[in-house]
Structure formats: C-alpha cells, structure tokens
C-alpha cells in the first residue's frame, strides 16, 4: 500500500463564508399530541422503537446529522402499555424527558423509574432499554447530540 501524504491547501487571505442562519422553528402541543397518537397506533417495529425525529425545515441543507438545531436532535418516542424496546447502546449522550405516562429504563443493569415530567440521563456506551409497565401510553422526548457525532463521522451505534 502506498504511503498517504497530507497536502497543503493555501488559504492565505481567504475568510470563511458567513454561516446561513436558521429561522426559529416551533412545534406546538397539538402537533406532539397528533404524533403521539399516530405513533401509538403503529405496529411495534422490530427494534421496539416507535420514534420520530424532530428536525428543523432547513436541517437538510447540512446533509448528515438532522436535528432541530445543528448538533442537537430531539426525538419523540412512544411505548404502549406492556411494551419495551430492544437493548441498544451508542456513544451519543441522551437526556430523556417523560411527557406522558410512566415506566422505567434499565441502564447498565440499574433501574430508573420515571413518571410524567421526570427528566433523566445516562452515560454513553451503556446498554439500555425503556419499558412501559403502566396501563397508559408512555411518551418521552429525548434530546441527543447524535447529529454532531454523525457530522464528524464518529457516531457509534
């Protein structure tokens, strides 16, 4: 295999182009309620994750790493009563906010019970599942830095 050599790119006197700023975007309560209903009526996918990414209308302009803001992706996740996700782990960080119902998560063997309005996180690279052990629909908003890692091509799932 031939040796790869770095190259010099002369940028003398050049400035970076001004960033394209995004307009504010809002997702209303009624939109969340409609999406929770839609997701809860779907059959359970193979990975046990009914979810919708919440992305800014201009996010596609950045290519990989869709989010509501560059580097941040809110996700709406729904579990029906008695359901649980399959185990997963990744190097992105997540903050979970229960917006409807209750349940628990198992994170690296530790149980985290939660109910509506509870906020919790767990370290990256820890295997976890979410469980709805209640008799009503569970909905969580999860905020993740996965888009930032995807843009850097270092997101591991």
What name fits each language-model region?
Residues 61-73, 80-95:
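A short beta-loop-beta micro-motif enriched in histidine and acidic residues
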């Amino acid at each position: 295999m031939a040796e790869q050599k770095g190259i010099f790119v002369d940028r003398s006197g050049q400035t970076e182009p001004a960033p394209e700023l995004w307009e504010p975007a809002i997702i209303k309560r009624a939109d969340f309620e409609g999406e929770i209903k839609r997701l809860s009526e779907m059959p359970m996918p193979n990975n046990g994750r009914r979810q919708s990414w919440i992305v800014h209308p201009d996010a596609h302009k950045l290519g990989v790493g869709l989010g509501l803001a560059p580097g941040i992706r809110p996700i709406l996740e729904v579990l029906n009563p008695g359901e649980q996700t399959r185990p997963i782990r990744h190097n992105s960080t997540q903050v979970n906010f229960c917006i409807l119902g209750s349940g628990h998560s198992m994170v690296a063997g530790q149980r985290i019970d939660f109910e509506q309005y509870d906020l919790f996180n767990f370290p990256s690279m820890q295997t976890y599942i979410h469980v709805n052990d209640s008799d009503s629909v569970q909905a969580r908003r999860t905020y993740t830095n996965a888009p930032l890692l995807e843009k850097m091509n270092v997101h591991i799932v």
